[in-house]
UniProtKB/Swiss-Prot annotation:
Subunit structure: Homotrimer; each monomer consists of a S1 and a S2 subunit. The resulting peplomers protrude from the virus surface as spikes.
Segments on the Extracellular face: 19-1096
InterPro entries with a match to the protein in the record: CoV_S1_C, S2_sf_CoV, Spike_S2_CoV, Spike_S2_CoV_C, Spike_S2_CoV_HR1, Spike_S2_CoV_HR2
GO terms of biological process kind: endocytosis involved in viral entry into host cell; fusion of virus membrane with host endosome membrane; fusion of virus membrane with host plasma membrane; receptor-mediated virion attachment to host cell
Biological classification of the source: Viruses, Riboviria, Orthornavirae, Pisuviricota, Pisoniviricetes
The species this protein was found in: Avian infectious bronchitis virus (strain D274)
Keywords in alphabetical order: Cleavage on pair of basic residues, Coiled coil, Fusion of virus membrane with host endosomal membrane, Fusion of virus membrane with host membrane, Glycoprotein, Host membrane, Host-virus interaction, Membrane, Signal, Transmembrane, Transmembrane helix, Viral attachment to host cell, Viral envelope protein, Viral penetration into host cytoplasm, Virion, Virulence, Virus endocytosis by host, Virus entry into host cell
Protein name: Spike glycoprotein
Site positions per UniProt: Cleavage: R538, S539, R691, S692
Heptad repeat 1 (HR1) as annotated region, ranges: 770-875
Length: 1154
C-alpha cells in the first residue's frame, strides 16, 4: 500500500527529503507525507551514483546573469544532483544565479532577479527582494511559479532532479513534481564564485531502507552486490549467524525458443477471380463513356489467380495504331498474368465495344491502365469512339480493362503460395536464459546431458520433455543432426548457493560450484567476501577447539571471513567406576556369555531450504506476489539454521567428550584370535637354509615334489660319496619302496655301469642288473604316490574352498540384513522431508499445482488469488518441516547424551549398573559406526541358575562385659548368609560364600532401629477412621459420573527397533564355518637336489682365474703401482722396483722436459 500511495498522491504540498548515504555514493528519496513505520522496508527511491565531476565557474568576469538559463550540461540519467560546498552559495550575481533541470518537454529552474531595467529578467521578470523563484517552463511558457523567501533557503546548497514523477529537490526539499516520469536530459548551475559545483549522475535501483521515527537511518541498495542480494531477498538487513540460500534474479538473461518441428509450411490463401463471357451485352452508343463494364473485380492484398479460360474461344487483336489492344504500361498478356506478377493495386473489368479505337481511347480517357481487345466475329453494331465517328458502326469486340499500380501488396499466382519457416534451435548453454521450450516458458540454466541420458532410453517413445513437480521442464530432447540430444534445465542459480553470516556480518558465499578464488569446504566451496566484494582464495588458517560462530562440518567461519578447523579437545584420562552390588534374594551361581546389540542415533540429517525456490519455483509472477509475505521465509530459515548450528556444536562436543587421546594408535602385539585361524595372513617366521650361499652359487639345484620319507633319504645320502648309498637309503611309504625321482650324474654313471656289466656274460652276471631295476621301480613308486596325493589334495582344496565361499556368502547376507535394519530405522527421518516434497504436487484448493498453468489459464488478479493458496499451503509444509527438524533435534540431542554415557560407562570402563550396557552384568562393549549413529555390541554375562539362600541383615552381639552392638555387611562386600547353620558372606551378584573377616563388616552402636514418635497434631494429614468417611467424601465429587478405562488390548503402536542379534549369531556361525574350512592336506615335501658341474667347467674356471691374475699384475707393473703389489701380494721379482717409480717415467728436479 505504501508504494501505491506514493504513485497516486498529489505531492505539491508535501515536503520530501533526499538524503545522501554511503560516502555520497547514492541518494535515497522518500516523501515525508508517507513515512513508513519503524523497520526495514523495500521499495523504489534509491539512485546509485555512476559518474561524478565538478565545475569551478562558468559566468566569466562580469558576473552571472540572473533570471535566465545560460549554462547547461546534457545527460541521459535517472537522476542528477548538483551540490555546492557545505557552506552553500549566496543568492547574488557574484556567486549563484540560476540552476535548472531539463526533462526534455519542460524545464524546472530556480533563480533570483531583483532588477527592474529592461531585459534584465528575461524569464521571470522582477522578483521581490530577498525572494527566489522556482518555475517550470514548457515551450517558452511558464506554467508553474513558486516564490519563496530566502529566510527558508538562506543559501543555495543543492538542486536534485529525479525522473520519478519529475521531482525536483532544492536543498533536499521537494519543490516541484508532476504526473510524468521522465529521465533528466540536461541540467546545470550558472554561477560565478562560491564553488565548485559537484555533479552526480545516477541510475535508479531498488533499495531496502531502515526507518526510525519516519527517517531513513540506513539504506541497502538492491544492486546485485552480495549485501544487496541477501538483504533485498529476505527484506531485512539484520541477520543472525547461519546460512541463507539465495537466488540471483538480476542476471542478464538471453532468450531462445525450442520448436517442435525443424520447419513449418504455411499455405497462404489464394483468391480466385473467374471471368466469363457476358451474353446479351448491349453495344455502346458512341464514345468510350458509353461502354458498359461487367464483372469488375478489385484485389485488396494477398495472392490472386485471375481465370480467363473463356478467352480460348476469342481471338486476341494486337495493337495496330488505333485498332486492337493498347497496353504499353503492361508488359504481360492476360494468358500470363498469373506468372507471379506484383501489384500495389489491381482491378479488372470486361466491356463490349468497337475494336477500332476502343482500347486506345479508353486508356487515353483514364478508364483503364491497359486494355486488351479480343474478336469473336461479332456484328458491326458498335459506334465509334472518336468525334467524327460517333455515329459510324464498327465490329464489336471483347475489351478487357486492367487498372493497376506497381507495388508489393498483391501477387498473382497459378497455385497457392506455401511459406516455409525454418526453425533453428540455437540452444544457449551454461548461462541463465529465458526459454520457450515447446510452448512452455521459464528461465533456467541449460546443460547438455546427452552423454548421461543416451543409454537409458529416456523419451524414446516420441516424448519431448520431462516435467518436474512444479510443472516446469526438467529434461527435454531435441532431434540433432546425429540423433537425439538431451538437455537439463536447472535453476539459474544453484539452490545450494548460500550466503554465510557470521557475527552478524556477511562474510562469504557457500556454493557447490568450484569458482575462481574459492576454496573447498567439506562438499562445498567457500568464497570469502570483504567489504561487500569477493576476495581471492585463502587457505584455512589455524585450529580451534570450539567455535562460538557459524560452523560448517568441522570448519569454523569467523566474523572476519577466515576459516579455522575445529579440533575437539581430547580426553586425557580414563575414569573407571568401582564395583557395586545389587539387591537380590536369589544369588546366581552359573552364567552365560551374552552378546546384545544397541543402535543409538547421534546425528541428524540437516536440510537446506531455499524457501523462495520451493514456494515459487521459476515463476516470476509468483516471486513478485511472494514479496507481500514479508519475513516468513526468514523465520522458517532461522529455525532450520539454529537447529543446524546446535546440531554441529553438540556433535563436536559429543566427539570431544568421548574421543580418547591417541585412540588411533594400533596395538599389534599379543594379538590372540582364539580358534579363528588367520595364520595365512601373517608373515611366517624365518628358518635356516639347508645349504650355504657358496653351495647355492657353485651348484645347480633342482627342486621336485617329495614325500615325507625324502627328508630321511637326504640325511642318509649326505656326504661326498652319498650317491653310492642311493639304493641302501631307500625308504618305505605305506608298504611301498620309494626313492626320489631325481638322479644325479654320478648315480646315472653308477647304475649304467651296473647294467652294462650285468649283460657282459649273460646269465652269469645278470644279477648285477638287480640294483638298476630295484631303484627304477622305487622311483616309479615315488612318482605314482606323489601324483595320487596331489589329486587327493586338489579335491580337498576344491571342497574346502567351496565350503568357505558358502560361509562367506552367508556372512555377507547376514551383514546385509543387519545393515538393512539400521537403514530402516534411519530412513524414518526422511518421511517428513518426503511429505514436504510431495506437497509440491498438492494444489491446496487452487485449480492446479502448476504455477505456469494457472497464469496461462487465468487473468492476473484471478491467478494471484489461486497462487496465493498454493503459497500459503507450501509455507505451511515448510513450517511443518522446520518444526519436525526441531523436534528431531531435541530427540537426537537426548540420544547423544545417552550415547555419551554409553561410551564413557560401557566402552571406556565396566559398568556397575545392571543391564545398562546390554542385558546382565557388563563385561565389554565394542562400538561400531552406523549411519547417523553408533551400534554398540555389548558382551555381558547373564545368570543361568540361582541359589536360594537365607540372607541375614546383620548380627546383634551381646558381650559379657560390655554393651551390645550390631554388625552389618560393609558396603560392596555382599550379604550375610546362613548355610547349614554356619554364617558366611557372599557377593550379591555371584554365589561365593566365604568366612566373614573384619574388613567385611561395619559396627553399629545399637541393635535397635531408631524411630521418632509423634502425635496427630504434628502431621495434620493423618486421620482416624472414625472421623473421615471416604465413601461420603468421594460421593461429593464423583457422583453420577461414568469412567471407563480404555481397552489396552486394542491399543496398537509401532516402535522401530534395531535387532541384529540373530545376524550376529549367523556371523559367528560363518566364522566357525570358515575355521572348519581349513585344509588338512596330505603332507608333501620339496626335495632339492644339487647337481655338481662337470670337470671341464671346473677346468675352464681355473684357466680364467690364472689369466685374470697375470693381466692384473701386468697392469700394476706398467702403471707404476707396483707398490701396491709389493705391499699387498709380496711379488719377489718386483722388489727392486718398489722403492721408486718405473724407470720409463723417472725424472729429477733439474731435468727439463721439452
Amino acid at each position: 500500500m505504501l508504494e501505491r500511495s506514493l504513485l497516486l498522491a498529489t505531492l505539491l504540498s508535501a515536503l520530501c527529503s533526499a538524503n545522501l548515504f554511503g560516502n555520497n555514493s547514492y541518494v535515497y528519496y522518500y516523501q515525508s507525507a508517507f513515512r513508513p513505520p519503524d523497520g526495514w522496508h523495500l521499495h523504489g527511491g534509491a539512485y546509485e551514483v555512476v559518474n561524478v565531476f565538478t565545475e569551478s565557474s562558468n559566468a566569466g568576469t562580469t558576473g552571472c546573469t540572473v533570471g535566465a538559463i545560460y549554462w547547461s550540461k546534457n545527460f541521459s540519467a535517472a537522476s542528477v544532483a548538483m551540490t555546492a560546498p557545505q557552506n552553500g552559495m549566496s543568492w547574488s550575481t557574484e556567486q549563484f544565479c540560476t540552476a535548472h533541470c531539463n526533462f526534455t518537454d519542460f524545464v524546472v529552474f530556480v533563480t533570483h532577479c531583483y532588477k527592474s531595467s529592461h531585459g534584465s529578467c528575461p524569464l521571470t521578470g522582477l522578483i521581490p527582494q530577498n525572494h527566489i523563484r522556482i518555475s517550470a517552463m514548457k515551450n517558452s511558457s511558464l506554467f508553474y511559479n513558486l516564490t519563496v523567501a530566502v529566510t527558508k533557503y538562506p543559501r543555495f546548497k543543492s538542486l536534485q532532479c529525479v525522473n520519478n514523477m519529475t521531482s525536483v529537490y532544492l536543498n533536499g526539499d521537494l519543490v516541484f513534481t508532476s504526473n510524468e516520469t521522465k529521465d533528466v536530459s540536461a541540467a546545470g548551475v550558472h554561477f560565478k564564485a562560491g564553488g565548485p559545483i559537484t555533479y552526480k549522475v545516477m541510475r535508479e535501483v531498488k533499495a531496502l531502507a531502515y526507518f526510525v521515527n519516519g527517517t531513513a537511518q540506513d539504506v541497502i541498495l538492491c544492486d546485485g552486490s552480495p549485501t544487496g542480494l541477501l538483504a533485498c531477498q529476505y527484506n531485512t538487513g539484520n541477520f543472525s549467524d547461519g546460512f541463507y540460500p539465495f537466488t540471483n534474479s538480476s542476471l542478464v538473461k538471453e532468450k531462445f525458443i525450442v520448436y517442435r518441428e525443424s520447419s513449418v509450411n504455411t499455405t497462404l490463401e489464394l483468391t480466385n477471380f473467374t471471368f466469363s463471357n457476358v451474353s446479351n451485352a448491349t453495344p455502346n452508343t458512341g464514345g468510350v463513356q458509353t461502354i458498359q463494364l461487367y464483372q469488375t473485380s478489385t484485389a485488396q492484398s494477398g495472392y490472386y489467380n485471375l481465370n480467363f479460360s473463356f478467352l480460348s474461344s476469342f481471338i486476341y487483336k494486337a495493337s495496330d495504331y488505333m485498332y486492337g489492344s493498347y497496353h504499353p504500361s503492361c508488359k504481360f498478356r492476360l494468358e500470363t498474368i498469373n506468372n507471379g506478377l506484383w501489384f500495389n493495386s489491381l482491378s479488372v473489368s470486361l466491356g463490349y465495344g468497337p475494336i477500332q479505337g476502343g482500347c486506345k481511347q479508353s486508356v487515353f480517357a483514364n478508364r483503364a491502365t491497359c486494355c486488351y481487345a479480343y474478336s469473336y466475329n461479332g456484328p458491326s453494331l458498335c459506334k465509334g469512339v472518336y468525334r467524327g465517328e460517333l455515329t459510324k458502326s464498327f465490329e464489336c469486340g471483347l475489351l478487357v480493362f486492367v487498372t493497376k499500380t506497381d507495388g508489393s501488396r498483391i501477387q498473382t499466382r497459378n497455385e497457392p503460395f506455401t511459406l516455409t519457416q525454418h526453425n533453428y534451435n540455437n540452444i544457449t548453454l551454461d548461462r541463465c536464459v529465458e526459454y520457450n521450450i515447446y510452448g512452455r516458458v521459464g528461465q533456467g540454466f541449460i546443460t547438455n546431458v546427452t552423454n548421461y541420458a543416451i543409454n537409458y532410453n529416456y523419451l524414446a517413445d516420441g516424448g519431448m520433455a520431462i516435467l518436474d513437480t512444479s510443472g516446469a521442464i526438467d529434461i527435454f530432447v531435441v532431434q540433432g543432426e546425429y540423433g537425439l540430444n538431451y538437455y537439463k534445465v536447472n535453476p539459474c542459480e544453484d539452490v545450494n548457493q548460500q550466503f554465510v553470516v557470521s557475527g552478524g556480518k556477511l562474510v562469504g558465499i557457500l556454493t557447490s560450484r568450484n569458482e575462481t578464488g574459492s576454496q573447498p569446504l567439506e562438499n562445498q566451496f567457500y568464497i570469502k567476501i570483504i567489504n561487500g566484494t569477493r576476495r581471492s582464495r585463502r587457505s584455512i588458517t589455524g585450529n580451534v577447539t570450539n567455535c562460538p560462530y557459524v560452523t560448517y562440518g568441522k570448519f569454523c567461519i569467523k566474523p572476519d571471513g577466515s576459516i579455522s578447523t575445529i579440533v575437539p579437545k581430547e580426553l586425557e584420562h580414563f575414569v573407571a567406576p568401582l564395583l557395586n552390588v545389587t539387591e537380590n534374594v536369589l544369588i546366581p551361581d552359573s552364567f552365560n556369555l551374552t552378546v546384545t546389540d544397541e543402535y543409538i542415533q547421534t546425528r541428524m540429517d540437516k536440510v537446506q531450504i531455499n524457501c523462495l525456490q520451493y514456494v515459487c519455483g521459476n515463476s516470476l509472477e509468483c516471486r513478485k506476489l511472494f514479496q507481500q509475505y514479508g519475513p516468513v521465509c526468514d523465520n522458517i530459515l532461522s529455525v532450520v539454521n539454529s537447529v543446524g548450528q546446535k546440531e554441529d556444536m553438540e556433535l563436536l562436543h559429543f566427539y570431544s567428550s568421548t574421543k580418547p587421546s591417541g585412540f588411533n594408535t594400533p596395538v599389534l602385539s599379543n594379538v590372540s584370535t582364539g580358534e579363528f585361524n588367520i595364520s595365512l595372513l601373517l608373515t611366517p617366521p624365518s628358518s635356516a637354509s639347508g645349504r650355504s650361499f657358496i653351495e647355492d652359487l657353485l651348484f645347480t639345484s633342482v627342486e621336485s615334489v617329495g614325500l615325507p620319507t625324502d627328508d630321511a633319504y637326504k640325511k642318509c645320502t649326505a656326504g661326498p660319496l652319498g650317491f653310492l648309498k642311493d639304493l641302501a637309503c631307500a625308504r618305505e611309504y605305506n608298504g611301498l619302496l620309494v626313492l626320489p625321482p631325481i638322479i644325479t650324474a654320478e648315480m646315472q654313471t653308477l647304475y649304467t655301469s651296473s647294467l652294462v656289466a650285468s649283460m657282459a656274460f649273460g646269465g652269469i652276471t645278470s644279477v648285477g642288473a638287480i640294483p638298476f631295476a630295484t631303484q627304477l621301480q622305487a622311483r616309479i613308486n615315488h612318482l605314482g604316490i606323489t601324483q595320487s596325493l596331489l589329486l587327493k589334495n586338489q579335491e580337498k582344496i576344491a571342497a574346502s574352498f567351496n565350503k568357505a565361499i558358502g560361509h562367506m556368502q552367508e556372512g555377507f547376507r547376514s551383514t546385509s540384513l543387519a545393515l538393512q535394519q539400521i537403514q530402516d530405522v534411519v530412513n524414518k527421518q526422511s518421511s517428513i522431508l518426503t511429505e514436504t516434497m510431495a506437497s509440491l504436487n498438492k494444489n491446496f484448493g487452487a485449480i492446479s499445482s502448476v504455477l505456469q498453468d494457472i497464469y496461462q489459464q487465468l487473468d492476473s488478479i484471478q491467478a494471484d488469488a489461486q497462487v496465493d493458496r498454493i503459497i500459503t499451503g507450501r509455507l505451511s509444509s515448510l513450517s511443518v518441516l522446520a518444526s519436525a527438524k526441531q523436534a528431531e533435534y531435541y530427540r537426537v540431542s537426548q540420544q547423544r547424551e545417552l550415547a555419551t554415557q554409553k561410551i564413557n560407562e560401557c566402552v571406556k570402563s565396566q559398568s556397575i549398573r545392571y543391564s545398562f550396557c546390554g542385558n546382565g552384568r557388563h563385561v565389554l562393549t565394542i562400538p561400531q559406526n552406523a549411519p547417523n549413529g553408533i551400534v554398540f555390541i555389548h558382551f555381558t554375562y547373564t545368570p543361568e541358575s540361582f541359589v536360594n539362600v537365607t540372607a541375614i541383615v546383620g548380627f546383634c552381639v551381646n558381650p559379657a562385659n560390655a554393651s551390645q552392638y550390631a554388625i552389618v555387611p560393609a558396603n560392596g562386600r555382599g550379604i550375610f548368609i546362613q548355610v547349614n547353620g554356619s554364617y558366611y558372606i557372599t557377593a550379591r551378584d555371584m554365589y561365593m560364600p566365604r568366612d566373614i573377616t573384619a574388613g567385611d563388616i561395619v559396627t553399629l552402636t545399637s541393635c535397635q532401629a531408631n524411630y521418632v514418635s509423634v502425635n496427630k497434631t504434628v502431621i495434620t494429614t493423618f486421620v482416624d477412621n472414625d472421623d473421615f468417611d471416604f465413601d461420603d467424601e468421594l460421593s461429593k465429587w464423583w457422583n453420577d459420573t461414568k469412567h471407563e478405562l480404555p481397552d489396552f488390548d486394542e491399543f496398537n503402536y509401532t516402535v522401530p527397533i534395531l535387532d541384529i542379534g540373530s545376524e550376529i549369531d549367523r556371523i559367528q556361525g560363518v566364522i566357525q564355518g570358515l575355521n572348519d574350512s581349513l585344509i588338512d592336506l596330505e603332507t608333501l615335501s620339496i626335495l632339492k637336489t644339487y647337481i655338481k658341474w662337470p670337470w671341464y667347467v671346473w677346468l675352464a674356471i681355473a684357466f680364467a682365474t690364472i689369466i685374470f691374475i697375470l693381466i692384473l699384475g701386468w697392469l700394476f707393473f706398467m702403471t707404476g703401482c707396483c707398490g701396491c703389489c709389493c705391499g699387498c701380494f709380496g711379488i719377489i721379482p718386483l722388489m727392486s722396483k718398489c722403492g721408486k717409480k718405473s724407470s720409463y717415467y723417472t725424472t729429477f728436479d733439474n731435468d727439463v722436459v721439452t
